[in-house]
Every structure is written in C-alpha cells, then in structure tokens.
Amino acid sequence: QPDRIPIDFGGTATSGIHVACVAALRDYYGLKRQLVKVHEPYQMLGWIEDDLAEVLGIDVAAVIPRATMFGFPNTKWQPWRTPFGLEVLVSEHFKTKVDENGDTVIYPQGDTSVPPSGRMPKGGYFFDSIVRQAPIDDDKLDPRDNLEEFGPISDADVAHIRSEVDRASATGRGVVATFGGTAFGDIALVPAPFLKHPKGIRDISEWYISTVIRRDYIHEVFSRQCEIALANLARIHAAIGDAVDVVFVCGTDFGTQTSTFCSPDTFKSLYMPYYKKVNEWIHGHTRWRTFKHCCGSA
C-alpha cells in the first residue's frame, strides 16, 4: 500500500508548471541560478531539474515525446527572452516573429516559410493555436485527412523513448510516460499546430459540431487512430518492457468551468469504446498503469 499521496509536478503536459513559476521556485529555494528550459512551448512549461524535484518532494520523473506541440525536437538549447521579460532556453527550432499587433507567433516544425501555427497575444504567457481551416466540403471529407498526424512510430521515436525511460528510471522516482497517439479528440491537438498544412476538420468549433452532426466521420477517425495506437504500444513495450509505471494516455477535456462538454451517453458511445480498447491492451499486455486527464469532468 502507498505510504502517502504521490506528488506529480511536471510529469505530463497536464501537470506541468509554467516556466516563470519554475524560475521563481528555483529562486525561492536558493537553487543554482540557471536558465529554465521550455520543454513544452505550447503552454510554455518549464523543465523541472532534479534539484527542484527533490526540494518539492516530487515523486515522478517524466518521459516526454521527442517532438513538441509545434512539431520540432528540443535540440541545441539556446537563450530566448520571452515577451514577459524572462530569459529562458528554447530549442534551436523554436522560431518566432512579432506581428503588427505585437503578438508573438511561432511556426510549425520551425519552418518560417509556412503560416504560423501558434500565437502568444501581447501581454500573454503562453501560445494559442492558430486555426488554419480550409473550406469544408462535406461531400469531399476524408477521415484520412484527420489521421495525418497518426502513423507507425519511427525508429527515432522508439530510441528516444528508450533513452528517456532509462534516464527517468535512474532517478528512483515513479516513471510517468507520454507516448502520444492515444488521445481521442483532444482539442489541443485537433488544430494540429505541429503540422505545416493540416487537412481535414481542424477548426475547434467545427470539430465539436462534428461530434454531433458528423459522428460517423469521427468514429472512422477514432477507429483507425486506435488501430495505429495499439500497434505502436506493442512496439514500445517490446523496446522498454515494464520499466514505465504510468502512461499518460489522453488529455481530452470533458469538463468546462460549469458543466461537461458532452453527456455521459455521448461519452459512452463516442469515446469510451476506444479508451476501453487502449486500456484493455495495456492492462492485458503490460504492468503499466494508465492516467486520463478529464479537466475535472469525473
């Protein structure tokens, strides 16, 4: 039996700490002065180094994907001064410009030759997705367009996961891993800020409308996504075994400030079949536990 409630700060994208808070915590605890790495630029989350994890009493170590929400890897860290005045470290592929409104825009995969996919409003502290929705013709909608970001996991991604699991395991903390590909309808992912020219249904409002009026389309997307995900999980497990304690399977929000995004019946018919398949595979083939973020909609 556990001896206490485990503490998770920074284990997943839904339990992270903003880079400004990480920097302030390092100062508060008198830790070594250093620039904080922005490992997840979409929310501007700061990487929690071992010294801070120790003083905060954090019980988990994170394994995060090789690519960020904007589709680039965190390689060759370089300094960047944020619009809110904090100097941080970002990937060499973190490419931004300030537009005519004073907003900071960021580019998918670090490619400034394509339209930006994220915007940090002037005075803001994190990025919002820029919706890049082509006109929708219901007669030509193809579920494969909403599956562009899902595919067989690459050798590079498997190698990254294996390396990061080894690093996290060496900390002695519980290993919480994000492999990707198992989030069904996560609205943060629908606009695809990591793709240069996303196709399919990418507008946030249009996606939620589609869960009502284009439900067959959504089922086709989820069904194929689930097939791909299960194959990828099998390959990941073959590479790392049961070295992971918890897998963050999905960040899809079902809660609002006042209620839920959908009824329990809709959840059971549209989403639950796919969560059930993922969880049954994990619990049937591994010793991993699973974690599902629901945004308070328990």
Give the role of each language-model region.
Residues 1-27, 31-38, 118-298:
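Active-site loop segments of alpha/beta catalytic cores
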Residues 85, 89-117:
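Low-complexity, serine/threonine/proline-enriched polar segments
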Residues 62-78, 179-185:
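Short, glycine/charge-rich beta-strand/loop segments that flank catalytic centers
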Residues 22, 26-71:
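Segments that shape or occlude catalytic/ligand-binding pockets
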Residues 6-9, 61, 105-106:
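Short, hydrophobic/proline-enriched secondary-structure or compact coil segments at domain edges
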Residues 81, 88-93, 150-157:
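Extended, Lys/Arg-enriched charged tracts that mediate electrostatic binding to polyanionic substrates
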Residues 51-55, 87, 96, 164-170:
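Short, charge-rich binding segments
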Residues 71-73, 77, 94, 116-117, ...:
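Alpha/beta catalytic barrel-like cores
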